[in-house]
Amino acid sequence: MIVVSQAPVPLAAGGDDIVASTRAAVAAGFERISLPHALMYLEEVEPALAEVAVRARETPAVWVGTIPEEAMYRAVDAALRARNIALVNDPAAHLEVFEFDRAYPKLGALTARTVVVSTVGEVAAAVATVGLPAFLKGALLSRKHSGWGACVANTVVEAQALAEALLRRKYLSRGRVLVRELLPLRRFTVPASDFPVGREYRVFLLDGEPLAHGYYWPYRGEWAALGAAEAAAMLAVASEAARRLRTRLVSVDVGQLEDGRWVVIEVGDPQFSGLSFIDPRTLWAALAARLAR
């Protein structure tokens, strides 16, 4: 098993999620292959992997790093496969979960109603379908870091303005905006942000089976604790979502509605997902055990 890491060499003390995951992966028995942290050009891939030997048999690998463009992911995947090293998520599988509009048709009623638009002119019809207020995000990422007003529209005009801002930010949208039903999630206010936090949890899964999970938001309160029955119900929704997708390694964010039911907020590729409150040691030990089967 191999971890393809963009963490610095040697690993810094402390560090970000990439460093923490790399450290945990090595401790769990993964061999480390390094890629530059600032991998910007396709021409850099082959030189970066030049000293990596061809394996006698196909060896599974997990990439831990910064969000790559589609072309970069394909280039790294091809260079590794030439050495008989196979990323757990091939390029098509990576895109299925990383660009939410690809996953949405398979998730169906597990998640909020969603309409995908690629122009501002399509927004009014999308809003008519999902209703107001509506939540808008890019195909990749939202603007939650900029606050509630950067994501939630109460009028068609506001929705059009949010869509225009997302379409300008290709690193968030890749040219597509998701206009989503604003679900009645359980929400709590925190002093540090005007974006209300919910009872939302991130789950990492391999082949539909949970590896590890943790509270999503970077704030802790009594609302974050899960009872055994709640955890089982939440994980069941995450597992069902993962089983509907062809992608092997998946992150599923699950939130609780005001009526107590659980829904999928979004999905992603754990190779480039934040850990939230997931213990990296637990995650990578479980992943090592599953890949060794």
Region locations from a protein language model:
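Catalytic phosphate/metal-binding cores of nucleic-acid and nucleotide-processing enzymes, i.e., regions
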Residues: T114, G131, R143, S173-R174, ...
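Active-site nucleotide/adenylate-binding loops and adjacent lid/helix of ATP-dependent enzymes
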Residues: M1-L11, G15, V52-A56, V76-A192, ...
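Short beta->alpha transition motifs characteristic of CBS
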Residues: E209, H213-P218, V267-G274
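Short, surface-exposed charged micro-motifs
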Residues: E200-R202, D253
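ATP-binding N-terminal substructure of ATP-dependent carboxylate-amine bond-forming enzymes
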Residues: M1-A86
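A structural preference for short, hydrophobic beta-strand core positions in alpha/beta folds
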Residues: R32-L35, N89, V116, V254
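C-terminal active-site "lid" helix and adjoining low-complexity regulatory extension at the edge
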Residues: R244-T247, Q256-R293
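Short acidic-glycine loop/turn motifs at beta-strand connectors
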Residues: L205-E209, L257-G260
